[in-house]
Amino acid sequence: MKSGRFIGVMSGTSLDGVDVVLAAIDERMVAQQASYTHPIPLQLKKDILGMCQGQSTTLSAVGKLDAQLGILFAEAVLALLAKEGLSAQDITAIGCHGQTVWHEPLGEPAFTMQLGDNNRIAAMTQIATVGDFRRRDMAYGGQGAPLVPAFHHALLAHATEKRMVLNIGGIANLSVLLPDSPIRGFDTGPGNMLMDAWIWRNCSLPYDKDACWALSGHVNQPLLEQMFNDPYFRLPAPKSTGREYFNAAWLDKQLARIPGVTAEDIQATLAELTAVSITEQVRLAGGCDRLLVCGGGARNPLVMARISALLSGTEVCTTDDAGIRGDDMEALAFAWLAFRTLSGKPGNLPSVTGASRETILGAVHPVSSW
């Protein structure tokens, strides 16, 4: 496939909405044309969180959530098409990541589960849909994540400048794009996830807007050291994680060991944990001249300020400064991965995921004969 118009659909660990992006894509260029964020109903969000955090469930509940998410993702695509005055015939394919409810890359056997029925998306939109991107990489011994570094390299790598791309979603992940070196990428640990969980529990707010609550507190050093002592932070790459590990139950275990910390100081310490765990991994990966940040955490002034302070000598900016809207980065990546799949080209990077080989990713759900 030489070119086409693709739609990428992404619902990440932050659960702050379904991101939908339209882009014209060919071998040399990804040109974003439109974007839209579709709301996630509150009850559906609660159902997702319950499943992600290991609460007991049933096959019926899993199947129902899979169908509900397929419908939600299809509605998000249809809303974007209506907003832009487009029809199904204008679109080559959809690339849908799905909603991760469990990710266990070190299991025996390793597995990952993304819900959102791609058959339903294809049927409701009448657009060929590519999904289930992660499990083929796992079948070849990889972690199935992260997959976005290949896209970061295609768009943002530089011939001489040492660059890294940092996505701060619910989980933070880093793409290491150093000249004349293999591409690397991995999850550094919690991004917004723990901060969001804590402010939701205490203030019934979905996130700490402008870090106002965190800025009212102070970092508690014993608590920070207790949390940063978690074995995940010392694991070598390749490594990946998610809400099934860094969640409210994990936080409660840490707090039980350091009692008496005020709620606002806990929020400030969680922001510091995100910044420290990221910058430590940047240093261990060799450092960079320029750190390009995307995701919701790029709008957290405290986290961004701390990253800049901890990485003196590195220019810390957003991907918006490089011409790519940070909020759309991951959805755009899965539109690009759908293009790679339909072009018969590999989408994973063994140097990132640990897979034994490059491979074409995803399953294709057509709406007509090929």
From Swiss-Prot:
Source organism superkingdom: Bacteria
GO MF annotations, alphabetized: ATP binding; kinase activity; phosphotransferase activity, alcohol group as acceptor
Covalent S-S links between cysteines: none
Keywords, in A-Z order: ATP-binding, Carbohydrate metabolism, Kinase, Nucleotide-binding, Transferase
Pathway: Amino-sugar metabolism; 1,6-anhydro-N-acetylmuramate degradation; Cell wall biogenesis; peptidoglycan recycling
Record-listed E.C. numbers: 2.7.1.170
Pfam families per UniProt: AnmK
CDD domains on file: ASKHA_NBD_ANMK (cd24050)
SUPFAM superfamilies referenced in this protein's UniProt entry, alphabetically: Actin-like ATPase domain
Any GO BP: amino sugar metabolic process
Known catalytic reactions: 1,6-anhydro-N-acetyl-beta-muramate + ATP + H2O = N-acetyl-D-muramate 6-phosphate + ADP + H(+)
Sites where the protein binds ATP: 12-19
Similarity annotation: Belongs to the anhydro-N-acetylmuramic acid kinase family.
Function, as annotated: Catalyzes the specific phosphorylation of 1,6-anhydro-N-acetylmuramic acid (anhMurNAc) with the simultaneous cleavage of the 1,6-anhydro ring, generating MurNAc-6-P. Is required for the utilization of anhMurNAc either imported from the medium or derived from its own cell wall murein, and thus plays a role in cell wall recycling.
UniProt-recorded name of the protein: Anhydro-N-acetylmuramic acid kinase
Top-level taxonomy: Bacteria, Pseudomonadati, Pseudomonadota, Gammaproteobacteria, Enterobacterales
Gene that specifies this protein: anmK
